[in-house]
C-alpha cells in the first residue's frame, strides 16, 4: 500500500492485483499528483471525466464530484472499486464506462492519463471531441518520457491548441483547449489478412499488436493442441487469433475468449463473426480479471500468452494470477499451454504451481510450455 496526500483528501492506495511486500510497486504516480494540483483552486462545473485511471487515484481523490471513470481495463475498474472501499468512499460515487461507450455531454473537467498506445489515445480524443466545449478544462498527464511530439500533435489535430508544462517529479502535463479543428473520419477498427489463411483480422484501438500478427502469437500458433474436446480457454485473448485457430483445430471443442480489455473481447467476437460465423455457437466471450469467479475443474485446456507488464510497469503479477487461476479452473489432467519470452523463466514458475512443466518448443526468443493439473495441490 502507498499513501497519496493531495488537496482533496488523504488516500491509502494499493495496486490490483496486489504486489509483494519485497518489491512493491506504487498505486499512483507523480502525474496523478500533478493533475490534482491543477484543480486545487478550480470551481468544477459540469461532469468530471477521468480517462485511464489505472488504480483509481484520481477517481478516489475527486469522488465528491461524482466522476466518470472511463477506460479499457476491467482490472483498473476493480482496482478503483477496491481503493474506494479501502478509503471508506461509497463505490456509487464513481460511474464506470468503457472507452467505446458514449461520454457524458459538456463536461466541466477532463483528466487524461496518457495511455501506452497512440491508437487508444486517438480513439478517446475523438470520443471527447463529440462532447467537450471550449470551456471544458482538458488536462492530460504522464511521465515526461512518455509524452512525445506525436502525443502533442494528436491533441492538436483532434481537439485544438495544446501546450505542455515543465517537468515536475519527472512528470509533465498537457493542457488543451477545444476549438473543433477540421478532422476526417476514422474507422473504428483496423484490419489485415492473416497469412496462410483466408481470415481477415479486425482490431479495436487498444488491442496488442494492432496492425499485424505479433511474433509470439505466430510461434504459438505453430504448436497449438489439436482434436481437444470440452471447453478450452483463450486467456488474455486479445484479438482472438489464438482462439480462432483453436476453433479450427478442435472442431469438437468450445472456446472461451477471456480478456480484461472490453476492446479485446469485442475484437475477438468480431473476428469470429467475420471469419468463422458457423462456430459462434461454440464460443463464449468474457470480460474478466483472468478467471476470477469461474468455477473450479471446468476446463480441459487453457492457452495463454501472458503479459509481463501492467500499464507502464514491468511486473509478473498478472501472469502469476493467470497461472494460479488456470490451475484452479482446469479439470484433473487438464493442460495449460503458454508462450513467453525465454528470459522470463516461466518454466520454474509453472513447475512450482503445477508440480510439472514440459517444454513443447523453443526458438531464440520464445518458448512454448505445457503444465498438467495432476491432482489437488494446496
Swiss-Prot record:
GO terms for cellular component: cytoplasm. GO terms for molecular function: 23S rRNA (guanine(1835)-N(2))-methyltransferase activity; nucleic acid binding. Its main location: cytoplasm. Coiled coil: none annotated. Its EC number is 2.1.1.174. It holds the Pfam family MTS. It is an enzyme of class 2 (transferase). Disulfide bonds: none annotated. It is found in: Cytoplasm. It catalyses: guanosine(1835) in 23S rRNA + S-adenosyl-L-methionine = N(2)-methylguanosine(1835) in 23S rRNA + S-adenosyl-L-homocysteine + H(+). It comes from the Bacteria. Keywords: Cytoplasm, Methyltransferase, rRNA processing, S-adenosyl-L-methionine, Transferase. Specifically methylates the guanine in position 1835 (m2G1835) of 23S rRNA. Belongs to the methyltransferase superfamily. RlmG family. HAMAP family: 23SrRNA_methyltr_G. NCBIfam families: PRK15001.1 (NF011577). This is Ribosomal RNA large subunit methyltransferase G. The gene is rlmG.
